Curated annotation (Swiss-Prot):
Single biological process term from Gene Ontology: regulation of DNA repair
Name assigned to this protein: Regulatory protein RecX
Localization in the cell: Cytoplasm
Annotated transmembrane regions: none
HAMAP family: RecX (MF_01114)
Keyword field: Cytoplasm
Membership in a protein family: Belongs to the RecX family.
Function: Modulates RecA activity.
GO CC term, one of those recorded: cytoplasm
Organism per entry: Listeria innocua serovar 6a (strain ATCC BAA-680 / CLIP 11262)
Main location class: cytoplasm
Amino acid sequence: MKITSISVQQKNKERYNIFIDEKYNFSVDEEVLARYQLMKGKTLTEADIEEIKQADMVRKGLNKAINFLSHRVRSEKEIRDYLRKQEMEPFAVDEILKKLADMDYINDVEFAELYTKTQIKTTLKGPRTIERELVEKGLTREIISQVMEEYASDIQLENATKQAMKIMKRNNKSAKKMLQQKIITDLIQKGYSSEVAKMAAIEATSELDVADEADILQKQVEKTIRKNKRYKPSIAKQKTITSLMQKGFSYDTIQSYLTENEISFEEEE
């Protein structure tokens, strides 16, 4: 089989169409064209063509991978998953990853270090959340343990406290005890240890005093009473007390407030 003509593709000047015996047969990247010294008049066997096609697949995949990496640093697993989605053959994926490693495009340790530092500085994620994300990105336990040393306990507490302050602002209608529990629960879900979560909850609510809690209770009592006005007095009282207890106020505190403020649930005559 002989190459009878070679033409540059219209939409991609770095790719060439190869015609064998006057018929289009395959296309190749410019680098593959030069490597295999493809030119008009050259004779190729079926094995030659198959080898060239495989080399071109690797070249195309390499170009795609480099473009994929141009947006941000990636882990080896992220690149492997990307290439598989591009329907690259397994042999091509392995060869592309080897070439990228040789070109210093892949380094999981450097990736993990950069990713961890970025997450610590730009987000308020807890260490366990970052660890889970690194696992999902294919990092080994050894690498994860190494890079997580960057997340020192004092920085964890600082970030957890900032997160706690945000949680507190969204839940400013609850008693201090309930608010602290809400903060602890949310922080644990965000990847912080229970110990750090407790310290952050205490720190975030440290400025809440008795007067603040009394003010919150007053507003909640007024709101809950209005909501339960349609019920009979005994039911309205029970629903009000239950609702307030669910917000973290103790039964004794509620009863004392109702008594001291002479709040009655009896129907007015």
